[in-house]
């Protein structure tokens, strides 16, 4: 994102946090694409429970209202609100907790090298995750060492 898009993403993040405070939802990411008049603002929220379509519609309406009232986006724009989906990387502890029991592909740093492992996520707290590898070995990885983690699809 360029500086203008990053500034806009930061403003949208703040407004989204205001809308979802006190709910079970949390903000995962905001991405801004395009230029004045053709902007697309993508907001990703998640929950440790199922993300409901009715909730998404209501939250989207509230975010859109605040964006318009505060004149955050210069010109017309398209607001897209969704859950991150299975293909997006996991970035927050709550996302890991939600996916305990699933198989993950995790890229992490170890002694200055980058390694990749595939294993079943058996635990996740606010500091680290635990994977059970195919060898039955259990591996604890602090979030600070993880550079990317994705759900490994079974097909």
Swiss-Prot record:
The gene behind this protein is: rimP
Q: Is Cytoplasm a UniProt keyword of this protein?
A: yes
Where, per UniProt, does this protein localize? Answer: Cytoplasm
Stored Pfam families: DUF150_C, RimP_N
Q: Has keyword Amino-acid biosynthesis?
A: no
Q: Which GO terms describe its biological process?
A: ribosomal small subunit assembly; translation
What's the protein called, per UniProt?
A: Ribosome maturation factor RimP
Q: What does this protein do?
A: Required for maturation of 30S ribosomal subunits.
State the family named in the UniProt similarity comment for this chain: Belongs to the RimP family.
Q: Which GO terms describe its cellular component?
A: cytosol
What keywords tag this UniProt record?
Cytoplasm, Ribosome biogenesis
State the PANTHER family in the record.
Answer: RIBOSOME MATURATION FACTOR RIMP
* InterPro entries referenced in this protein's UniProt entry, alphabetically: Ribosome_maturation_RimP, RimP_C, RimP_C_sf, RimP_N, RimP_N_sf
């Amino acid at each position: 994102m360029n500086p203008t898009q990053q500034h806009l993403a930061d403003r949208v993040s703040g407004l989204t946090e205001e809308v979802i405070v006190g709910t079970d939802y949390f903000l995962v990411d905001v991405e801004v694409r395009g230029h004045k008049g053709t902007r697309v603002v993508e907001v990703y929220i998640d929950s440790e429970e199922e993300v409901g379509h009715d909730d998404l519609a209501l939250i989207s309406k509230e975010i859109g209202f605040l964006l318009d009232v505060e004149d955050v986006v210069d010109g017309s724009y398209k607001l897209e609100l969704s859950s991150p989906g299975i293909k997006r990387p996991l970035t927050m502890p709550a996302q890991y907790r939600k996916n305990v029991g699933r198989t993950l592909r995790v890229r992490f740093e170890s002694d200055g090298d980058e390694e990749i492992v595939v294993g079943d996520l058996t635990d996740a707290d606010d500091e680290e995750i635990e994977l059970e590898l195919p060898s039955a070995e259990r591996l604890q990885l602090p979030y600070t060492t993880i550079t990317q983690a994705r759900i490994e699809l079974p097909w």
